[in-house]
Amino acid sequence: MAKIDVHHHFYPQAMREALERAGGDPSGWYIPPWTLDLDKEISRVLKVQTTILSVTAPGPGIETDPGKAAALARLCNEEAAAIRDAHPLQYGFFASVPSLFDTAAVLAEIEHAFTNLHADGVTLYTRYGAGHSYLGDERFRPIWAELSKRRAVVFIHPTHAVDTQLINSWMPQPMFDYPHETGRTAMDLLTRGVIRDYPGCKIILSHAGGTLPYLIHRAATMLPFMPRNLGMSREEIVEAARTFYFDTAISANPVTLKALLEFAKPGHVLFGSDFPNAPRGAITHFTSFLEGYDNMSEETRRLVEREAALELFPRLRGQSTRACL
């Protein structure tokens, strides 16, 4: 089946140059090679028909000057739109935005990206600023309100933790720490009421939701008994967590995939590769495991590989139908 890949990065030249000026990715990850030819080649190998491009962390915020960060987001979005326009059956994109603390600049870029460039959604990172300002932060509510009004698809990608020290020199943060950051921001969104208050957003969590599916029952069972509680039962908290969408990037293994499929709502699990940031051997390994996984129905497989994404990105439905004829 021709897949739709919702977790797939690209490196505009301006982004690569900004990372090099900053001394590299603060997470400790290397900057991988990327070209459109390499991108198309991996899509053929993975049997991907349509890729939704995104700029991975740290994104435009690598520029600490607000004006430069906004300009970098604009350059990334213009380049992504040009790729999509040249190959509309093969590509879409999630728009980049500057730091969420720059509310006016973020709202301006959302307006440009959705109205003028027809972005398929927007990328947000798990936290912003020098502290633990996860995505439920009250200061980010005007942005959530705008995205909910637009019924936007929001792709949440982890970024480095406040503490950038590595476990050891073999373990850059994306390898082990990133899923914790995804779980933390998901719980922040749940406990601060963002999920409840802005239901128009369709939120994709990277890497099978990080630690959320594994730990949600632990937190949801304790929260109702805490002095400061949410006024929600355990069941209501768990059900709120199930409103997220989840991608399979670097996560299709016997333990994680089984747990994710049991936890997520039908149609809320989407294929993702994490190209080019994950090593190619890891990408093909996890994809092969997903393709050979026999503990899911054919209906579920169709949803994961393609059909669930078509519900989120309806513009692809007519195009993909014609392309498959």
UniProtKB/Swiss-Prot annotation:
GO function term, MF aspect, one: 6-methylsalicylate decarboxylase activity
Pathway connected to this protein: Mycotoxin biosynthesis; patulin biosynthesis
Coarse class of the protein's main subcellular location: cytoplasm
Statement on biotechnological application from the UniProt entry: Patulin was originally used as an antibiotic and specifically trialed to be used against the common cold, but it is no longer used for that purpose since it has been shown to induce immunological, neurological and gastrointestinal effects. Genotoxic effects of patulin with dose-dependent increase in DNA strand breaks in brain, liver and kidneys have been detected in mice. However, more recently, it has been proposed that patulin might also have anti-tumor properties.
Signal peptide: none
Record-level GO BP terms: patulin biosynthetic process
Keyword Metal-binding listed: yes
GO CC aspect terms: cytosol
Residues annotated as transmembrane: none
Class of the enzyme per the UniProt entry, highest EC level: lyase
Annotated keywords: Cytoplasm, Decarboxylase, Hydrolase, Lyase, Metal-binding, Zinc
Localization per record: Cytoplasm, Cytosol
The EC number(s) this enzyme carries: 4.1.1.52
Annotated catalysed reactions: 6-methylsalicylate + H(+) = 3-methylphenol + CO2
Pfam entry (one): Amidohydro_2
Sequence positions that bind Zn(2+): H7, H9, H157, D274
Expression induction or repression: Strongly expressed during patulin production whereas it was very weakly expressed in non-patulin permissive conditions.
Subunit field text: Monomer.
Protein family per UniProt: Belongs to the metallo-dependent hydrolases superfamily. ACMSD family.
Its job: 6-methylsalicylic acid decarboxylase; part of the gene cluster that mediates the biosynthesis of patulin, an acetate-derived tetraketide mycotoxin produced by several fungal species that shows antimicrobial properties against several bacteria. PatG catalyzes the decarboxylation of 6-methylsalicylic acid to yield m-cresol. The pathway begins with the synthesis of 6-methylsalicylic acid by the polyketide synthase (PKS) patK via condensation of acetate and malonate units.
Protein name, entry field: 6-methylsalicylic acid decarboxylase
Organism: Aspergillus clavatus (strain ATCC 1007 / CBS 513.65 / DSM 816 / NCTC 3887 / NRRL 1 / QM 1276 / 107)
Lineage: Eukaryota, Fungi, Dikarya, Ascomycota, Pezizomycotina
Gene designation per UniProt: patG
